[in-house]
Amino acid sequence: MKTVFILISMLFPVAVMAQKSVKISDDISITQLSDKVYTYVSLAEIEGWGMVPSNGMIVINNHQAALLDTPINDAQTEMLVNWVTDSLHAKVTTFIPNHWHGDCIGGLGYLQRKGVQSYANQMTIDLAKEKGLPVPEHGFTDSLTVSLDGMPLQCYYLGGGHATDNIVVWLPTENILFGGCMLKDNQATSIGNISDADVTAWPKTLDKVKAKFPSARYVVPGHGDYGGTELIEHTKQIVNQYIESTSKP
């Protein structure tokens, strides 16, 4: 009987977490991480990779909302924004992309038409201009704290990785880190798309991330399941294995 009770107690938090997940369409699902933070997964076709699930985040404070990354297109982004409005009773006012790729800024055009303010690494802004993509309005170089009606969203550029311009966003009131595509999930075994990566800098960037956010409760990667700080070291192992395999004569 005692064994059964312990097993039920261990499973109960998982059941509670599962109850906080919702599928709002065939290609978008949302999971609540805390009272104010949600992570979403959008499924879309990415050239050369097939159907890919991509993560982003929704942060809520006093009926205002911030999106960290968008789905890959305007249609999915509109669906997500409408869900935030209708289900969370919040207006999306703020957008912060992880880097310049489509699975981060694909819906920026729609957000701009809605008057949403966007904040990005200046490198992301420059790359978006160069490639003829929608361009975020407000840039920073090393770090920027964006206030969501008093709730700090701390943006940091700590170096190149999956992309030369990738950042992380820290939510200090929630102890949640959005690492984006710089980080791999625990099930990942491949380095993935490195067409725009700075592979040499990547391990050093990860060391900075690990040192800066040792207390993160949740760490959310760009693709795959969220976890804890172990994702940082796991990603470093994958990158180092790739570097070693490609440096052999």
Swiss-Prot record:
Catalytic reaction(s) noted: a beta-lactam + H2O = a substituted beta-amino acid
Regulation: Competitively inhibited by 4-morpholineethanesulfonic acid (MES), SB236050 and biphenyl tetrazoles (BPTs). Also inhibited by chelating agents such as EDTA and 1,10-phenanthroline. CcrA is not susceptible to inactivation by the beta-lactamase-blocking agents clavulanic acid or tazobactam.
Effect of C181S: The overall structure of the mutant is the same as that of the wild-type, however the site of the second zinc ion is unoccupied
Localization of this protein: Periplasm
Cofactor: Zn(2+)
Co-factor note (free text): Binds 2 Zn(2+) ions per subunit. It can also bind Cd(2+) and Co(2+) to a lesser extent.
Biological processes per GO annotation: antibiotic catabolic process; response to antibiotic
Residues where substrate binds: K184, N193
SMART domains: Lactamase_B (SM00849)
Signal sequence, start to end: 1-18
EC number: 3.5.2.6
SUPFAM superfamilies reported for this sequence: Metallo-hydrolase/oxidoreductase
Sites where the protein binds Zn(2+) 1: H99, H101, H162
Annotated GO CC locations: periplasmic space
Molecular function, one GO term: zinc ion binding
InterPro entries the record matches: Beta-lactamase_class-B_CS (IPR001018), Metallo-B-lactamas (IPR001279), NDM-1-like (IPR050855), RibonucZ/Hydroxyglut_hydro (IPR036866)
Residues involved in Zn(2+) 2 binding: D103, C181, H223
UniProt entry keywords in alphabetical sequence: Antibiotic resistance, Hydrolase, Metal-binding, Periplasm, Signal, Zinc
Its job: Confers resistance to the different beta-lactams antibiotics (penicillin, cephalosporin and carbapenem) via the hydrolysis of the beta-lactam ring.
Quaternary assembly: Monomer.
Name this polypeptide is given: Metallo-beta-lactamase type 2
Native species: Bacteroides fragilis
